[in-house]
Amino acid sequence: WIMGHMVNAIAQIDEFVNLGGNSIETDVSFDDSANPEYTYHGVPCDCGRTCTKWEYFNEFLKGLRKATTPGDSKYHEKLVLVVFDLKTSSLYDNQASDAGKKLAKSLLQNYWNNGNNGGRAYIVLSIPNLAHYKLITGFKETLTSEGHPELMDKVGYDFSGNDEIGDVAKTYKKAGVTGHVWQSDGITNCLLRGLDRVRKAVANRDSSNGYINKVYYWTVDKRATTRGALDAGVDGIMTNYPDVIADVLNESAYKAKFRIASYDDNPWETFKN
């Protein structure tokens, strides 16, 4: 999965997919009442990027729905996965469940079209703080009470705080999550980060009793870093330059081993060689 980073304006969906992305990451900020409000990152952000592009969250979802609904004039067949980077650090810990409930309602209405031919992309809820795991339970409860538990088949999870792998595993137990797990590792492109924790995550993914299904590394803009991540065995790379990742995947060393995921590739299944 080539994951376009910080896609917060509707116009950027086309831009990042046309550069080679089959996945996008979108920032979601919340108001004081835990309503998802804007797709907005703010300052500071990655080097070389504009930090302040934004939409109202529900409007972004409508644009995203068009981009992922077959037959729509804006449809992109290859856009198959969306990571919502949930900026919950503005919330109190006890608001996490409410944030999940309100997020589910927004997605149900504006993205899934109340279960009636909505957008088809798989969704990853990426949470920066282990203490906010009740966002997941609130989200699940709401889709169930609104009569659409089947949409949980399209939803996965990520804790993005670079926490100890063992602590993340314990948190998923508390949240009642037993699958659909992506594990991120990374840092802003302005700084360097080694691959030690990525390798630990990959080892967990490939062990018989691990909790991780997929591992992604962020934010990767350079060819050398891309090669390092691929050599470590990641499933996804988040980038400001999807074309750079696509180029490296075309190199003879990687062409035979990796391909770009399509809609038929289940993002919740651990890939077995």
Curated annotation (Swiss-Prot):
Catalysed reaction equations from the record: an N-(acyl)-sphingosylphosphocholine = an N-(acyl)-sphingosyl-1,3-cyclic phosphate + choline; an N-(acyl)-sphingosylphosphoethanolamine = an N-(acyl)-sphingosyl-1,3-cyclic phosphate + ethanolamine; a 1-acyl-sn-glycero-3-phosphocholine = a 1-acyl-sn-glycero-2,3-cyclic phosphate + choline; a 1-acyl-sn-glycero-3-phosphoethanolamine = a 1-acyl-sn-glycero-2,3-cyclic phosphate + ethanolamine
Transmembrane segments: none
GO molecular function: lyase activity; metal ion binding; phosphoric diester hydrolase activity; toxin activity
Enzyme active site: H5, H41
Residues annotated as binding Mg(2+): E25, D27, D85
Entry keywords, A to Z: Cytolysis, Dermonecrotic toxin, Disulfide bond, Glycoprotein, Hemolysis, Lipid degradation, Lipid metabolism, Lyase, Magnesium, Metal-binding, Secreted, Toxin
Enzyme class: lyase
Cofactors named for this entry: Mg(2+)
Source taxon at top rank: Eukaryota
Entry's Gene Ontology cellular component terms: extracellular region
Purpose of the protein: Dermonecrotic toxins cleave the phosphodiester linkage between the phosphate and headgroup of certain phospholipids (sphingolipid and lysolipid substrates), forming an alcohol (often choline) and a cyclic phosphate. This toxin acts on sphingomyelin (SM). It may also act on ceramide phosphoethanolamine (CPE), lysophosphatidylcholine (LPC) and lysophosphatidylethanolamine (LPE), but not on lysophosphatidylserine (LPS), and lysophosphatidylglycerol (LPG). It acts by transphosphatidylation, releasing exclusively cyclic phosphate products as second products.
UniProt protein name: Dermonecrotic toxin LdSicTox-alphaIB1aiii
Native source organism of the sequence: Loxosceles deserta
